[in-house]
Amino acid sequence: TAFMITSVFSLGCSYFETYQMQQIRAMGTTADVAITSLSEEQYEELSRSSLVSVVGVSQRLGSIDTSGMDDALLSITWIDETEWQEHRVPTISDIHGDYPQAKNEIMLPTWALRAMGIDDPQIGMNISLSYQLGTDYQYISDEFVLSGYYTDYSASRAGNRGAAYVSELFATQTGLPFDSVSTAMI
């Protein structure tokens, strides 16, 4: 009887943990709240607040021209170290390489690489992309270096929508105002 009760509780706990992980992966973040159009002052206030345990920043800088990639939609996004480590890494797997550091580095989910025709990605390989920044709909063609790639589970929920991660240096050099592109992830 004790064995049976222990087995039922073990199975129940394992099922709950697995279900919870599936939900987190489908959402693509462990954050509970997103505050859009965040000002730098609001970010500082949230960071100092004892009511908030973790505040990450996500900046949607623009989008990639995905016209040759079926129905995929990719944003160009920069996230800070806190957002990456605390909110995003727990929701992805099979991480190869590192988060971008140099201006021309990019990190992509494997489903996006496959949509680009890249089935065997290599760290350091060049990837040519056209993208637009902010509300300027003029596309820029540029060459990026793949700094990393990973398995993303949220694309199936979001219908092949995802992010191409870029470096803080890239984000800074866009000149886009902080409050027009920033979201606090809590």
Predicted regions and their residues:
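Basic-flanked hydrophobic alpha-helices used for secretion and membrane insertion
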Residues: S7, G12-I186
